[in-house]
Amino acid sequence: MMRFRHVVAAIFALAGVGVTGLPAVAQEQIGAVSTTFRLMSPNDKVVIERYDDPKVENVSCYLSRAETGGWSGAMGLAEDPSRFSIACRAVGPVTMKGKIPTDKKGEVVFSEDTSIMFKELRISRFYDTQKNVLVYLVWSTKLIDGSPYNSISVVPLN
């Protein structure tokens, strides 16, 4: 089922059609720096994006990630590297908008395709009830030497 969704998303992306219910993209790109100069095509870069948690008011996650340039990158055909960092912060009084799962599986809060097929970047939220904190995990669905790259950030709840 998951692969079918990726195939459908890829077909619609190539056709230039948006589909409701597919993974959300960054709500705001904060900035970017070029890392590799390419004379005739877009440069490779590191982008900084902000994602606001849809179920937790006033929690924003800032993600830096590598983005492949070149003509294939510009057309969305290149695979972005699985390297990223995350920092989530309370930017005001934290309010839960709905029930936050407390199980060990967590909840995928954001998801973004990072290649045309079968590779996603995901941000999952976990609730540590003992310490009263939200833990955000960014990870890639692509396995590197048997496990995905990942990074975490913790937001204390008062």
Language-model regions: role of each:
Residues 1-11:
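Bacterial N-terminal signal peptides that target proteins for export
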Residues 15-25:
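C-terminal segment of classical bacterial N-terminal signal peptides
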Residues 27-85:
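N-terminal secretory signal peptides
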Residues 48-51, 86-88, 123, 136, ...:
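Generic structural hydrophobic/aromatic packing signal, biased to beta-strands
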Residues 51-53, 66, 91-93, 141, ...:
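Generic structural motif
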Residues 52-54, 128-131:
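Short, ordered beta-strand-loop transition motifs
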Residues 60-127:
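Mature extracytoplasmic domains of secretory-pathway proteins
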Residues 129-158:
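C-terminal partner/receptor-binding element of secreted or periplasmic proteins
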